[in-house]
Swiss-Prot record:
Keyword terms of this UniProt record: Developmental protein, Differentiation, DNA-binding, Homeobox, Neurogenesis, Nucleus, Transcription, Transcription regulation
Annotated family: Belongs to the paired homeobox family. Bicoid subfamily.
GO biological process: dopaminergic neuron differentiation; forebrain neuron differentiation; hypothalamus cell differentiation; negative regulation of transcription by RNA polymerase II; neuroblast proliferation; neuroendocrine cell differentiation; neurohypophysis development; neuron differentiation
Organism the protein comes from: Homo sapiens
Biased composition (Low complexity): 90-102
Protein location: Nucleus
Region feature Disordered, mapped onto this chain: 32-112
GO molecular function: DNA binding; DNA-binding transcription factor activity, RNA polymerase II-specific; DNA-binding transcription repressor activity, RNA polymerase II-specific; RNA polymerase II transcription regulatory region sequence-specific DNA binding
InterPro entries reported for this sequence: HD, Homeobox_CS, Homeodomain-like_sf, HTH_motif, OAR_dom, OTP_Homeobox
Protein name in UniProt: Homeobox protein orthopedia
Known DNA-binding region: 104-163
Length: 325
């Protein structure tokens, strides 16, 4: 059977085999191992010799990995943390991980009802107690100052959340209109605008509209004050006819006519709606029919002589004139 040296001689030649054997002898001397057995061949290995002695170092290999098996090399490559430290203790990285796991464990504090009552009473006084108040409270209820501080932090967060929820449901802006929005027009203003538009939509020179409007205008009821004034004027005229005209009847009739005319004007030309402005009157003898709602110039001619004011005025003048005849 051929030895290891014979195989090297056959494969690599004498020169290469000598170089490899010399390199192996140098490694043995470096590791403090004696030379080869004098009775054996320089290339043979002893039965109980170190596997490093029989290994051949190639130029790219390290001495520490020569005697290692492939299985041990694979395990060391997969779990570098399991390798022992320089003094045989645990690896520093593994010890750091164990300390991190121990720090992550947190113990939940269970408060007794008496402790909770005392904490709530202090929270009602102030939401941000100082260090002295926390230490005093911790000594009183048998807790640490850090536990009391954490309880106050959690209690403040719960209080703020509850306050925000109640403010959302009780906010006045959710039920009332926004102040920036335009206000809705009143019913009177809307009716006045509708009446003005309906009156102005007809043409001012249309005689059919004036003729059709006369019966409806004549059938309008009188205001209560105007009816009382007319009845009083008729009763005064009848009394003057029965007793005869007194010396100052002319002044009385003139004052009565003037007062009745002023009353007519004051009652008839009060605006029906706040937004409508009455037209000015030129004098007591020339009374226009109604407020000037349209902006056309011929509307005054159409309304003149057809309104209830002019008819009542003529009736009153006729009654006063008949009282002197």
């Amino acid at each position: 059977m051929l030895s290891h040296a014979d195989l090297l001689d056959a494969r690599l030649g004498m020169k290469d085999a000598a170089e490899l054997l010399g390199h192996r002898e140098a490694v043995k001397c470096r590791l403090g191992v004696g030379g080869s057995d004098p009775g054996g061949h320089p290339g043979d290995l002893a039965p109980n010799s170190d596997p490093v002695e029989g290994a051949t170092l190639l130029p790219g290999e390290d001495i520490t990995t020569v005697g290692s098996t492939p299985a041990s090399l694979a395990v060391s490559a997969k779990d570098p943390d399991k390798q022992p430290g320089p003094q045989g203790g645990p690896n520093p990285s593994q010890a750091g991980q164990q300390q991190g796991q121990q720090k992550q464990k947190r113990h939940r504090t269970r408060f007794t009802p008496a402790q909770l009552n005392e904490l709530e009473r202090s929270f009602a006084k102030t939401h941000y107690p100082d260090i002295f108040m926390r230490e005093e409270l911790a000594l009183r209820i048998g807790l640490t100052e850090s536990r009391v501080q954490v309880w106050f932090q959690n209690r403040r967060a719960k209080w703020k959340k509850r306050k925000k929820t109640t403010n959302v449901f009780r906010a006045p802006g959710t039920l009332l209109p926004t102040p920036g929005l335009p206000q809705f027009p009143s019913a009177a203003a809307a009716a006045a605008a509708a009446m003005g538009d309906s009156l102005c939509s007809f043409h001012a020179n249309d005689t059919r509209w004036a003729a059709a409007a006369m019966p409806g205008v004549s059938q309008l009821p009188l205001p209560p004050a105007l009816g009382r004034q007319q009845a009083m004027a008729q009763s005064l005229s009848q009394c003057s006819l029965a007793a005869g005209p007194p010396p100052n009847s002319m002044g009385l009739s003139n004052s009565l006519a003037g007062s009745n005319g002023a009353g007519l004007q004051s009652h008839l030309y009060q605006p029906a709606f706040p937004g409508m402005v009455p037209a000015s009157l030129p004098g007591p003898s020339n009374v226009s029919g109604s407020p000037q709602l349209c902006s056309s110039p011929d509307s005054s001619d159409v309304w003149r002589g057809t309104s209830i004011a002019s008819l009542r005025r003529k009736a009153l003048e006729h009654t006063v004139s008949m009282s002197f005849t």
